[in-house]
Amino acid sequence: MPKEGITPRAQDYSQWYLDIVQQADLADYAEVVKGCIVFKPTGYAIWEAIQRGLDDRIKATGHVNAYFPLLIPKSFLMKEAEHVEGFAPEVAEVTRAGGEDLAEPYVIRPTSETIIGYFYSKWVRSYRDLPLLINQWANVMRWEMRTRPFLRTTEFLWQEGHTVHATEEDAERETLLILHEVYADFVEKEMAIPVIKGLKSEKEKFPGALRSYCIEAMMQDGRALQAGTSHNLGQNFARAFDITYTDQQNTIQYAWTTSWGVSTRLIGALIMTHSDDEGLVIPPRLAPTQVVVVPIYRNDAERSVVMEAVQRMTAEWKGRLRFKIDDRDNLTPGFKFNEWELKGVPIRVEIGPKDIEKGSVAIARRDQPGREGKSFVPQDGLTDRLTALLEEIQQALYRRALTFREDHTADVATYDELKQQVERGFARCYWAGTTEDEKRIQEETRATIRCIPLDQPQQAGRCVYTGKETTQQVIFARAY
C-alpha cells in the first residue's frame, strides 16, 4: 500500500516522481528563480557521494581538477557554428553590470568548451604539453522551458572534463576511457543502475562534436535517461580557438580535444530506477546513511537500558558503517519507521528491552518493504552481518533493475512493432535510415535513437524503417 502523500507509480508516474522528491526531503522549488531548485541536505548529500565516487575515478585516470569563469564572452560562443546553433535557445546573457551596458555581453556558462578552449590555446605550445587532462566541478545555466527537479532545471550542478591530445587516436582513446572506466563503472557499481554504452546518432550528438558516446539507462516507466556523455570533438574547437602545438618534427599542428560530463540528473536516475510506492530507495554504496537504529522503550528506565545497549552495539560501527541513532523522544517508533523508509535508508535496526534479553535485534531491509524484508538476528557478529547485508542489497538492486530493463526491451522488425514497443520500453532494431527518417519517427512516436550500442550483432538484418540491409542495430525509446 503506497504511503500517504505519494501517488502510486501505476496511477501517475510523473507525479509519483515529484512526490518522492518532496516527501523524501531531497529538494524544494525555488519559485522566485524560474526553473531552479534548492538542494536540501539529503539531496545534496547524495550529490556529494556521487562527486566522491566520480572524482576518485577521474583522478585515478590521470586527470586533475581546476575551475574556469562562469561568464563567457558571447563572441566565444559564436566561434563554433554547430555549437552556437545547438545552445543558442538555452543561453542566458548578462548585458549590464555596474549600472552600465557592457561593451560585449557575457553568457552564463551553458557548458565550457569555448572558455576553456581559449585558455588551452594559451597553455599548449609543444607536444610536451600533451595530453592536457583537466576536469572541473561547476554549476551550469540553460534556460529550459519545461523543468523537472534534478532531471531538467535552469541551473544544475555537474562535472565537465576537457582534454587536449596530439592525435585523433589519443582523443578517441580518452573518450572511451571516460565512458567505460569512469561513467559506466560508477553508475553500475555505485548506483546499481545497468547502462547501455553506445554512440549517439548524427541527430543526437553534441553540437560541434566529431562523435558522441553515452550511457543510457531505463527508468521504471520504460523511458530512457541519458546518464552521461563523452565527446570526441575532433579538431573543431581546436581550429576555432587556435589550439596548436609544435610536434617532434618542429611542425605546428592543430590539437584534438574531448569533453565529457555528468550532472545532477544522476539523482533523478537513482530515484526513478530504484524507488517504490513507499518512498525513496538509495543503493547502500551511495547512501549518506546506510543504517538507522531505532531504540524502542516505554519509560525512562527502559530508555536508559536500551540506549546503553545501543551505544555498545554501535561503538564498533564507527569507520565501518554510516549510521544514525534516532533517539527522538517525541515521536513513536512507528512514525520513525515510516520516515526512514520514506527517506530510503537501506537498513533499519530496531532494539528494545526484550531484544536485549534475547541478545538479538530486528533488521528491516528497505529494498524489501513489509514482513518480507524483516528478520531477527543475534547481536553477536552484527557488524559483519550488516556489512554483508548492505552488499547483498546493492547487488539485489542492480539485478532487479537489469531484469526490468531486459523484460522491457524487445527486438522489433517492423515500424509498426517499433511504435508499439516504445510505449513500454526499449525497441532494438536494425537501422539504415537518415537523420530525416529519424526526425519523422520522433514526430510520429516521440521516440529517438538513444544510442547505437557498442555491442553490435555479427549478422545482417533489414532496417526497421527503410527495409535496407544493414549490420547496425540501434535502440529507439522515449526519453527524459
UniProtKB/Swiss-Prot annotation:
Report the domain of life of the source organism: Bacteria
* Native source organism of the sequence: Roseiflexus sp. (strain RS-1)
Its subunit composition reads:
Homodimer.
The main place the protein resides is cytoplasm
Instruction: Give EC number(s), comma-separated.
Output: 6.1.1.15
UniProt subcellular location: Cytoplasm
* HAMAP family to which the protein is assigned, alphabetical: Pro_tRNA_synth_type3
Q: Which GO terms describe its biological process?
A: prolyl-tRNA aminoacylation
| Catalyzed reaction equations | tRNA(Pro) + L-proline + ATP = L-prolyl-tRNA(Pro) + AMP + diphosphate
The record's SMART domains line, in alphabetical order, gives: ProRS-C_1
Pfam families annotated for this entry?
HGTP_anticodon (PF03129), ProRS-C_1 (PF09180), tRNA-synt_2b (PF00587)
**Similarity-based family:** Belongs to the class-II aminoacyl-tRNA synthetase family. ProS type 3 subfamily.
**Protein name, per record:** Proline--tRNA ligase
Q: Which residues form a coiled coil?
A: none
Q: Which UniProt keywords apply?
A: Aminoacyl-tRNA synthetase, ATP-binding, Cytoplasm, Ligase, Nucleotide-binding, Protein biosynthesis
